[in-house]
């Protein structure tokens, strides 16, 4: 569960390393916590030098991994080692060209097929 002030890792090669959630938009409107597949507004806390994204820039991101366990559609409980997000644009397309680490299969059902196709592993 991601809420405002939560620090997240960035799971793509867009240039940012760490994000801090400042607002949860969610998939279904105004929510208190973000889960896998929800959209958040975040600020970049750490970035790679000489990249398009810089520190203190406000961006949109979709949650791809959470430490809080969740039950999949088939009943399996999945829990990841970190909280991670992929930076997206206004249309929902990822800004990076690679995605690092595993992502949840629920992203495919939420029409984030580009993120799923870039990921090396889908759980």
UniProtKB/Swiss-Prot annotation:
Q: What Gene Ontology molecular-function terms does this entry list?
A: large ribosomal subunit rRNA binding; structural constituent of ribosome
Q: Which CDD domains would you find in this protein's record?
A: Ribosomal_uL14
Q: What is its main location?
A: plastid
Q: Which PROSITE patterns match?
A: RIBOSOMAL_L14
Q: Give Gene Ontology CC terms.
A: chloroplast; cytosolic large ribosomal subunit
The record's subcellular location field reads: Plastid, Chloroplast
Q: Which domain of life is it from?
A: Eukaryota
Record-linked SMART domains = Ribosomal_L14
Question: Which InterPro entries has this protein been placed in?
Answer: Ribosomal_uL14 (IPR000218), Ribosomal_uL14_bac-type (IPR005745), Ribosomal_uL14_CS (IPR019972), Ribosomal_uL14_sf (IPR036853)
Could you tell me the keywords of this UniProt record? Chloroplast, Plastid, Ribonucleoprotein, Ribosomal protein, RNA-binding, rRNA-binding
SUPFAM superfamilies found in the cross-reference section: Ribosomal protein L14
Q: Which Pfam families match?
A: Ribosomal_L14
> Does the record's keyword annotation contain Chloroplast?
yes
Q: Which GO terms describe its biological process?
A: translation
Q: Which family does it belong to?
A: Belongs to the universal ribosomal protein uL14 family.
Q: What is this protein for, i.e. what is its function?
A: Binds to 23S rRNA.
Q: How does it assemble?
A: Part of the 50S ribosomal subunit.
Instruction: Kindly provide the name given to this protein in its UniProt entry.
Output: Large ribosomal subunit protein uL14c
Species classification: Eukaryota, Viridiplantae, Streptophyta, Embryophyta, Tracheophyta
């Amino acid at each position: 569960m991601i809420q405002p002030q939560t620090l997240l890792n960035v799971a793509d090669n867009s240039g940012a390393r760490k994000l801090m959630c400042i607002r949860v938009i969610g998939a279904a409107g105004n929510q208190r916590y973000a889960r896998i597949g929800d959209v958040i507004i975040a600020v970049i806390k750490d970035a790679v030098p000489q990249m398009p994204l810089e520190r203190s820039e406000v961006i949109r991101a979709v949650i791809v991994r959470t430490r809080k366990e969740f039950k999949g559609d088939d009943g399996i409980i999945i829990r990841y080692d970190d909280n991670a997000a992929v930076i997206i644009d206004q249309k929902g397309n990822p800004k990076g060209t690679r995605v690092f680490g595993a992502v949840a299969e629920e992203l495919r059902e939420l029409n984030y097929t580009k993120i799923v196709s870039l990921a090396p592993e889908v759980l």
